Amino acid sequence: MEDMSEAAEMGEHLAVAQALREQLWPHLDTDAPRWVLALLDPNHPVAVHDPLHVTRLAQRQPPVEWLPVRREDFLSSPELWPQLLVLRAPDRSGWIDEPLLDLTVAHALERRTSINGAYVCGWLVTDRDPADIARQMKRALQQRMSFLQQRALAWFEPHRWALLMASEDARAWLRTAMAGVHSWSWIDLAGHLNETLFTGHNEAPVAGALTSADWARQQRVPQARQVVLALTKADIDLPADAERHIDQALLQADVLGLILLEDRLCFALHSVGIGPQWHRHPAATACIECATNGESTLADALDALDDETLHRIAITAGEHVGTKTSKEFMA
């Protein structure tokens, strides 16, 4: 059975890799010079024996190239800077190392729900020299908050990128910040291949263009990753657009007054794993009130309910009836 599972995973990797090639091809079927770059993030590292570790990449044949993207917040740790791995270049016929493309896809799929974040963040097509793209990214990673204050944001991480794509303001900013990029492909939490098409080619990045709502979504990402980990451990399939669904659940937890991290995570787990309306059942509402009043944790209050009530809460949710109990979620 284990061999069959590994074979199925390999088949999925190859299918997604082929889908990526087909997604990229319309941008490459031109006489204009085009590069295809994979973005690696050593801040979410891989083991030294991993074939995508830079020490292993240096041993590949044919030789491959990569360029660092300077991070002002990691000046003393250049080994953590993002790397732009060149997969295709105008002066080469076809892919420089086609198995390497397959390897990046397999890695992105395997790490998509990791609590530690993605190492392979995406693939971009550009008509600009990779060194120019690295300089653009360096500038765009620093967000101006005020005249004197800047904040770094690793917006290229797939989870963060997916949230930015849900914001019209953020999409407009990224189109400006990444002028010269025609396409950005990434794999989301559910394992789906996505593509962002860029239009407009303004020259200078727009500093500080993200709204307060965009920043709030980004600040919830660490909690969202804990929700993803718990859902994965509970063997719950992540829905399409999981990044947005989880963020909306965490935001709703804020609105309802849930302060403790444990309560917020419990609320989000039920919202995604059972259904977004679960908290509207009177018994669920009472449990939430117990948590906000400090009488008990949300998980303990829910676990005190009988099976029939839990079943009715699941029906209220309108999604997956009776999938998991609170204890199973939080184990």
Predicted feature descriptions by range:
Residues E2-Q61, P68-R70, E79, L84, ...:
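A contiguous, surface-oriented mixed alpha/beta subdomain in the mid-to-C-terminal portion of proteins
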Residues L75-A89, A108-T113:
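Hydrophobic, conserved cores of late-appearing folded domains
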Residues P90, W95-R112:
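A glycine-rich, hydrophobic loop/mini-helix early in the fold
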